[in-house]
Protein backbone atom coordinates (compact mmCIF):
# COMPACT_ATOMS: atom_id res chain seq x y z
CA UNK A 1 0.00 0.00 0.00
CA UNK A 2 2.81 2.38 0.84
CA UNK A 3 4.32 2.02 -2.62
CA UNK A 4 1.05 2.87 -4.35
CA UNK A 5 0.42 5.72 -1.93
CA UNK A 6 3.92 7.09 -2.63
CA UNK A 7 3.17 6.94 -6.36
CA UNK A 8 -0.14 8.76 -5.79
CA UNK A 9 -2.18 5.80 -7.03
CA UNK A 10 -5.61 5.31 -5.50
CA UNK A 11 -6.30 1.73 -4.43
CA UNK A 12 -9.62 0.37 -5.68
CA UNK A 13 -9.68 -2.94 -3.76
CA UNK A 14 -7.31 -5.12 -1.78
CA UNK A 15 -8.39 -8.70 -2.30
CA UNK A 16 -8.75 -10.84 -0.25
CA UNK A 17 -7.90 -8.48 2.65
CA UNK A 18 -11.10 -6.92 3.90
CA UNK A 19 -12.91 -7.75 0.68
CA UNK A 20 -16.39 -9.15 0.42
CA UNK A 21 -18.43 -10.70 -2.35
CA UNK A 22 -20.33 -7.40 -2.56
CA UNK A 23 -17.05 -5.56 -3.31
CA UNK A 24 -16.13 -7.83 -6.23
CA UNK A 25 -18.32 -5.80 -8.60
CA UNK A 26 -15.80 -2.94 -8.28
CA UNK A 27 -12.82 -4.98 -9.50
CA UNK A 28 -13.25 -4.05 -13.20
CA UNK A 29 -13.06 -0.35 -12.29
CA UNK A 30 -9.31 -0.61 -11.72
CA UNK A 31 -6.87 0.40 -14.47
CA UNK A 32 -4.54 -2.47 -13.61
CA UNK A 33 -3.92 -5.09 -10.95
CA UNK A 34 -0.86 -5.36 -8.78
CA UNK A 35 -0.06 -8.91 -7.73
CA UNK A 36 2.81 -8.47 -5.26
CA UNK A 37 2.97 -12.18 -4.47
CA UNK A 38 2.47 -14.53 -7.41
CA UNK A 39 1.32 -17.33 -5.12
CA UNK A 40 -1.74 -15.29 -4.17
CA UNK A 41 -3.83 -13.56 -6.78
CA UNK A 42 -2.06 -14.35 -10.03
CA UNK A 43 -4.85 -16.56 -11.37
CA UNK A 44 -7.41 -13.88 -10.52
CA UNK A 45 -5.34 -11.22 -12.28
CA UNK A 46 -5.00 -13.45 -15.34
CA UNK A 47 -8.78 -13.99 -15.38
CA UNK A 48 -9.47 -10.25 -15.09
CA UNK A 49 -7.05 -9.57 -17.93
CA UNK A 50 -8.78 -12.15 -20.13
CA UNK A 51 -12.34 -11.14 -19.18
CA UNK A 52 -11.98 -7.34 -18.93
CA UNK A 53 -8.68 -6.56 -20.69
CA UNK A 54 -7.24 -5.35 -17.39
CA UNK A 55 -3.43 -5.64 -17.35
CA UNK A 56 -1.55 -6.74 -14.27
CA UNK A 57 1.89 -6.28 -12.74
CA UNK A 58 3.21 -9.40 -11.04
CA UNK A 59 6.79 -8.46 -10.21
CA UNK A 60 7.24 -8.63 -6.44
CA UNK A 61 8.54 -5.21 -5.30
CA UNK A 62 11.21 -6.69 -3.07
CA UNK A 63 14.86 -5.82 -3.46
CA UNK A 64 16.33 -2.98 -5.48
CA UNK A 65 16.13 -4.52 -8.95
CA UNK A 66 12.64 -6.00 -8.62
CA UNK A 67 11.26 -2.87 -6.97
CA UNK A 68 12.51 -0.75 -9.86
CA UNK A 69 11.09 -3.23 -12.39
CA UNK A 70 7.72 -3.32 -10.61
CA UNK A 71 7.50 0.49 -10.57
CA UNK A 72 8.47 0.70 -14.24
CA UNK A 73 5.72 -1.80 -15.10
CA UNK A 74 3.23 0.24 -13.08
CA UNK A 75 4.36 3.37 -14.92
CA UNK A 76 3.83 1.69 -18.30
CA UNK A 77 0.36 0.53 -17.25
CA UNK A 78 -0.70 3.94 -15.97
CA UNK A 79 0.67 5.77 -19.01
CA UNK A 80 -1.01 3.33 -21.39
CA UNK A 81 -4.38 3.46 -19.67
CA UNK A 82 -4.56 7.10 -18.60
CA UNK A 83 -7.37 9.02 -20.29
CA UNK A 84 -6.09 10.32 -23.61
CA UNK A 85 -7.63 13.71 -22.88
CA UNK A 86 -5.18 14.39 -20.06
CA UNK A 87 -1.95 14.06 -22.10
CA UNK A 88 -0.18 13.73 -18.75
CA UNK A 89 2.32 10.93 -18.46
CA UNK A 90 3.67 9.85 -15.11
CA UNK A 91 7.39 9.56 -14.54
CA UNK A 92 8.34 7.46 -11.54
CA UNK A 93 12.08 7.42 -12.33
CA UNK A 94 12.85 10.10 -9.69
CA UNK A 95 11.06 7.95 -7.10
CA UNK A 96 13.01 4.86 -8.20
CA UNK A 97 16.24 6.84 -7.97
CA UNK A 98 15.37 8.11 -4.49
CA UNK A 99 14.50 4.62 -3.25
CA UNK A 100 17.59 2.92 -4.69
CA UNK A 101 20.30 5.57 -4.51
CA UNK A 102 21.99 4.55 -1.27
CA UNK A 103 21.61 0.81 -1.46
Swiss-Prot record:
Pathway: Porphyrin-containing compound metabolism; chlorophyll biosynthesis (light-independent)
Bilayer-spanning residue ranges: none
Gene Ontology molecular function, alphabetical: 4 iron, 4 sulfur cluster binding; ATP binding; metal ion binding; oxidoreductase activity
Keywords in alphabetical order: 4Fe-4S, ATP-binding, Chlorophyll biosynthesis, Chloroplast, Iron, Iron-sulfur, Metal-binding, Nucleotide-binding, Oxidoreductase, Photosynthesis, Plastid
Cofactor annotation remark: Binds 1 [4Fe-4S] cluster per heterodimer. The cluster is bound at the heterodimer interface by residues from both subunits.
GO cellular component terms given for this protein: chloroplast
Documented EC number(s): 1.3.7.7
Cell compartments where the protein resides: Plastid, Chloroplast
Top-level class of the enzyme under EC nomenclature: oxidoreductase
The keyword 4Fe-4S belongs to this UniProt entry's keyword annotation: yes
Source organism superkingdom: Eukaryota
Cofactor annotation: [4Fe-4S] cluster
One GO term of the biological process aspect: light-independent chlorophyll biosynthetic process
Record Pfam families: Oxidored_nitro
Similarity-based family: Belongs to the ChlB/BchB/BchZ family.
Subunit structure: Protochlorophyllide reductase is composed of three subunits; ChlL, ChlN and ChlB. Forms a heterotetramer of two ChlB and two ChlN subunits.
Function: Component of the dark-operative protochlorophyllide reductase (DPOR) that uses Mg-ATP and reduced ferredoxin to reduce ring D of protochlorophyllide (Pchlide) to form chlorophyllide a (Chlide). This reaction is light-independent. The NB-protein (ChlN-ChlB) is the catalytic component of the complex.
Name recorded for this polypeptide: Light-independent protochlorophyllide reductase subunit B
Taxonomic placement: Eukaryota, Viridiplantae, Streptophyta, Embryophyta, Tracheophyta
Amino acid sequence: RRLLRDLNIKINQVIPEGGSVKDLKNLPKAWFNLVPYREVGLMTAMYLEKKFGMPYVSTTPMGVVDMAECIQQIQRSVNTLAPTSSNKKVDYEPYIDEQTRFV
